[in-house]
Amino acid sequence: MNLALNGQLQTIASGTGQLCFYVKGQGRPLVLVHTINAAASAAEVRPLFESLSQHRTVYAIDLPGYGLSERVDRLYTPRLMTDALHDLVQHIQAVHGTQTIDALAVSLSCEFLARAAAEQPTHFQTISLVSPTGFTGLKLRQAEEGKTYGLNWLWKLLKGPGWGLSIFNQLTRPKVIRYFLKKTWGSPNIDEEMYRYAVWTTRQLGAEHAPLSFLSAQLFSADITNIYDKLQQKVWMSHGTRGDFVDYRGKQRYAHSENWRFTVYESGALPYFETPDQFSAELLQFISPT
């Protein structure tokens, strides 16, 4: 078994299937949630897992369909991913008691974390959103609750004999994975350890199922502005200035909200890989009880 992180691998049986996550450290719990793409896993939060576990008990989840969690053939939706976070929080509270939890998510998974925090506000003390989706341009995403941008016709096409797996295999060739990571970093200086794990994880049985839902937009929420509006917790949003993910004009909506704060790094979309000490220090300051 190839582990993404240097921590204790734990597994729980949940309503969303078999969930795997890594645990390390002591103290108040902190949850880390990786991105969503064709090759995602908990390996994408490695610098934070290593540094923050010196101060907290850190839980880094493999979301359903990714990493070592269950990869069954099904439709993967925001509801499924959000419920997986609820299941993890329920487990954490059984271990640590019913104290509030700090949580950080990256990219599209910020939408799942925000939804979980909006649905169970008393479970979360702080929410950290790294390069979150739903802020491109000034368009408001205020569809009816639970609606997604999913293209059902495309998902059905991708699930057809041979099509989806063939496309997935093309998108996860080592050269293609490196290409997309360079676009994420906005630089050729990607993290090689993360790259190697991305190549490995896409070769595992069932690795295509969740990414095919991602490719057909099933995991993008059309109501996410309404969800972000509901957040009562302290929210820290951060992003970089390089690569494909630099348009966050939508954050203007929360510029004067007392519970929101913002940091822009001279980095790609994963600033904690490039400025790990600075990012970790600022995260620790943010999540420290006042």
Q: PLM ranges: what are they?
A:
Residues 230-267:
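Conserved loop-alpha-helix segment in the C-terminal half of the alpha/beta-hydrolase fold
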